[in-house]
């Protein structure tokens, strides 16, 4: 399973890439607006991210009409070979995905909240579908259940569209996504960091280092 970082913060992206565990990045207008300060422009932020990350970088259109979506998508595609165009799950969005797919432009259908929406996006030719599990949990639904259903549907019909689990709030979302067989999870930086943590890891490391000082008082490894 691939792990994408859901952020437009350059420092977070550099850190994740340096850890060697980030396969791509997803952004949206909200995330980019947080970084568009001190004269930084939208396009400049995206170009910088595309240079840092070798893998896919999702960039969202802001138009809600078919013609505008396609026009913006072509511009986004022109920013770099690894740019993926995020298109909302709407009637115009599906039409835009179909057009862009015919032009071999990778798309990520976003704001998916049920399995049928995911199926429609796949039929239109989306490269990725992004179901929002956290937002479903927020309204009392089991967001992960739709990931399971989408996986089953895509397996049934040998659909190649990748399931990109979004709106992830905690490590359990990541774990369940991996067990179900999602292709990608996109996580905020704080969740990415929490994936590495376990109190027993810290406890074990402290014990090893304490014991090692009995052999090497300064703690150094001498070979």
From Swiss-Prot:
The active site is at residue 86. Its EC number is 2.2.1.2. GO terms for cellular component: cytoplasm. It catalyses: D-sedoheptulose 7-phosphate + D-glyceraldehyde 3-phosphate = D-erythrose 4-phosphate + beta-D-fructose 6-phosphate. It comes from the Archaea. InterPro entries: Aldolase_TIM, TAL/FSA, Transaldolase_3B, Transaldolase_3B/F6P_aldolase, Transaldolase_AS, TSA/FSA_arc/bac. This is Probable transaldolase. It comes from Thermoplasma acidophilum (strain ATCC 25905 / DSM 1728 / JCM 9062 / NBRC 15155 / AMRC-C165). The lineage of its organism: Archaea, Methanobacteriati, Thermoplasmatota, Thermoplasmata, Thermoplasmatales. The gene is tal.
């Amino acid at each position: 399973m691939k792990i994408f970082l859901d952020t437009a913060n350059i420092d977070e992206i550099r850190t994740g890439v340096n850890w060697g565990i980030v396969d791509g990045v997803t952004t949206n207008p909200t995330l980019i607006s947080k970084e568009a300060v001190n004269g930084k422009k939208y396009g400049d932020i995206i170009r910088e991210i595309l240079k840092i990350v070798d893998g896919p970088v999702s960039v969202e259109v802001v138009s809600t009409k078919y013609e505008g979506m396609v026009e913006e998508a072509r511009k986004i595609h022109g920013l770099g070979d690894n740019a993926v165009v995020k298109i909302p799950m709407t009637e115009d969005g599906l039409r835009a995905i179909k057009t862009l797919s015919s032009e071999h432009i990778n798309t990520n259908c976003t704001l998916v909240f049920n399995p049928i929406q995911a199926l429609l996006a796949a039929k239109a030719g989306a490269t990725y579908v992004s179901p929002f599990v956290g937002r479903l949990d927020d309204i009392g639904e089991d967001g992960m259940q739709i990931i399971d259903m989408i996986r089953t549907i895509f397996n049934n019909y040998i659909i190649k569209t990748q399931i990109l689990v979004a709106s992830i709030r905690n490590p359990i979302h990541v774990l369940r996504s991996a067990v179900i067989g999602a292709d990608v999870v996109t996580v905020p930086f704080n969740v990415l960091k929490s994936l590495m943590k376990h109190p027993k890891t810290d406890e074990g490391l402290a014990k090893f280092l304490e014991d090692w000082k009995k052999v090497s008082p300064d703690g150094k490894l001498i070979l």
